[in-house]
Amino acid sequence: QVHAAVLKDLGRCDILVNGAGGNNPRATTDNEYHHEAKEGGKSFFDLDAAGVDFVFKLNFQGTLLPTQAFAKDMVEKKAGCILNVSSMNAYRPLTKIPAYSAAKAAVSNFTQWLAVHFANAGIRVNAIAPGFFVSNQNRGLLFNPDGTVMG
C-alpha cells in the first residue's frame, strides 16, 4: 500500500534510505559485565524474547521490507541506490544493548549481501554507520540520575 501511494504521488523510487532504528528497554541489561549483576538488576539472562524480537523487527525488517517493496522499481530501470543506516554498534558493540548491536550487525551484513545480489542489476547498495547519539531513549544507559556520565 505504501509503495502504491509513493508511486502515485512521487513516481518511481530512485534512492531508498532505510533509516528505521531503535531499541527497547526489555532488550537491554543493567550492567556492563556479568560479574557486576546485582540482585534485582536485569542481566543477560533476563532479556525478554519479545523485546529482542521487537528490536530485530524494527531494525532488520525495517530495512528488509522497504527494500523488497521499492527495489523492484530499481530492478526494472536497472538503476538505483539503496542506503541503509547501520550503526558503529554493528562493529564495536556497546555494553548493555546486545539486541540493538546484533540487529545493526544484521543490517550491515544484509547490506553487503544486497550489494552483491543487485550488483549486476545496476543498483548500488551501501550503509552508513553513525556513532552514538544521546536521546531520551538511551540517556539512562549512559548517565547517572544526577546527570554524570556512568563510569
Model-found features: residue ranges?
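Conserved mid-core segment of classical short-chain dehydrogenase/reductases
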Residues: 23-53, 76, 96-99, 139
